[in-house]
Every structure is written in structure tokens, then in C-alpha cells.
Amino acid sequence: MKFPVNSLVLTAAMAMIAMQAVAAEDAACKNVRFADVGWSDIAATTGMASVVLEGLGYKPTVTIASIPIAFAGMKNKQIDVFLGYWSPSMTPVIEPFIKAGQIKVLETPNLVGAKYTLAVPRYLHDKGLKNFSDIARFEKELGGKIHGIEPGSEANALIQSMIKDNRFGLKKFQLVESSELGMLAEAQRAGRSRKAIVFLGWEPHPMNVQMRMNYLAGGDDVFGPNFGEAKVYTVVAEGFEARCPNVARLLHNLQFSTDMESQVMGPILSKVRPNAAARNFLKKNPATYE
């Protein structure tokens, strides 16, 4: 999915050439097993990758699991591929598996230009909550809460560590764990009533156009510089590249854009199945195939 010039079809064609040039794969490679940790961006990229693989005669499957369970599944050779290693925020979680030689990170990121940090509605930003250091001043309005995503996520761990270590004076705050959809619903409810809320925001995601919101400055030491600027990498189970070289070549060529992902994520958040959302996007964007 290299989109500026290369395309899905070109990527697929490269894979077809690879299939002719490389020795036949293990029959088990036909069943490519993806992990999805319940994030709409990963559902979108996994959906697009699955559409390409299906067109090449593969039978991709998806397992929904938390991040630790997904990595454990790769360690145990129950999962082959995960398209959502957000670096650097997920590094503490994945590093033990990499050091143990159980997971391989592909060299080229599948997405650049992502970001990942705390955010607030624009009206709250305009009132003065613009920086991590401002959060404590708004404790009463916020109800002493910071809204995160699913339990076990590295983002929640970062927020919890801030609270535990009293970073930015947050020792009296509480992390509210939820799902992506649950957290966004809470943020949207707060927006309709113009209540104060601090929540986890990221891009790519439709929230950036669906809500008037601002990312908080000052969190470089927690989420990373430039509002948690991130690269997203593809990871595979150790040995997968050698066992399934044709699929591996395709995975090495998968690259997405923030705009593309956001367009596919929108329908997914409206309950459209990821593969269907991916197919619809590709049909509506024929230039993708050129």
C-alpha cells in the first residue's frame, strides 16, 4: 500500500512476481493470522491488508485480543502478523518479546506522521487547559478524571504512571479505563454539554474531524516529542518471514497514510465490517489502483 506512486495493485503484482520467483510456501501460509487489539486504525489497516491477500488467494483471519495477549500469541506461533506497533509509546511492552527473539519488527514503518497524546475539547483549550501542567488546575471541573482506553494498553500505563509519580501534580486524579468507542462516546457527551474532559487522542482517527479538539502541549517526556509523534510498524512472529516469504514480501511493501486510514476508520466506527469498509474505500478511490 505505497500510495503516492505505488498502489495496492502494484504491491499485489509485486507479490505475484515474488510467488513465481520464490519456492512454494508452506500450505499453512494460506491462512495468514492477524491480531487486532480493538483499535479502529488497526481494524482499518488489517482490513486493507486482508482485501489484498484475499485477492491473491489467501485466507486471512483476525483474532481480537489485548496487546499483551496479542504479543503472547505471536510468541506461541498462534498469531502471525500485527500491523499496529506504535513506536515509541508501545516499546516498553514489545521490547521483551523482541529481545527474546520471539517477535520481528519489519524495518520500514507502515505509517508515518501519527500522533498520540492527551487531548481536550476546544472550548476547554480556549479556557486555558493547553498544557499537561494545566490539568491539575482544572481538577474540580474534570472531576479528577483522565479518560483512557482499554485496560492493559500502554497508553493507560503511561497515564497511570503520571498519576502514581505525581507528574504535573496529578496525584489526586483517577484514570478511567474504557474502550476506544466508550471513551469517544464520553468525550462526545461532554462536548454536547460543554463539560470539561481530558481524554486520549490520536491521529489517524475520525475524531480529529468529528470533534473540535486540541492536543495538549508539554507531554514530551511521557508520550514523546511533537505531541507524541509516532511511527507505526508491522511485526511478525519470529520465523514467519522464512516460512512464508511471499506474504512477508507483501507485508514489507504495505504503507498507509493518515488520510487513508481515517477514511476507512469512519465506516468501521459506524459498525461497517473492516473488510467491507476497506473494499468500499478502494472502489471509491480508483486512483489507488493506478
Q: Predicted segment positions?
A:
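Immediate post-signal peptide segment of exported/extracytoplasmic ligand-binding proteins
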Residues: 23-33, 53-54, 137-143, 288-290
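Short, well-ordered beta-strand elements
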Residues: 26-41, 58-63, 143-147, 251
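Pocket-flanking alpha-helical
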Residues: 46, 63-101, 182-186, 206-212
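Ligand-binding cleft/hinge of the Venus flytrap
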Residues: 48-57, 139-173, 280-284
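Ligand-binding pocket segment of bilobal, Venus flytrap-like solute-binding proteins
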Residues: 79-84, 151-220
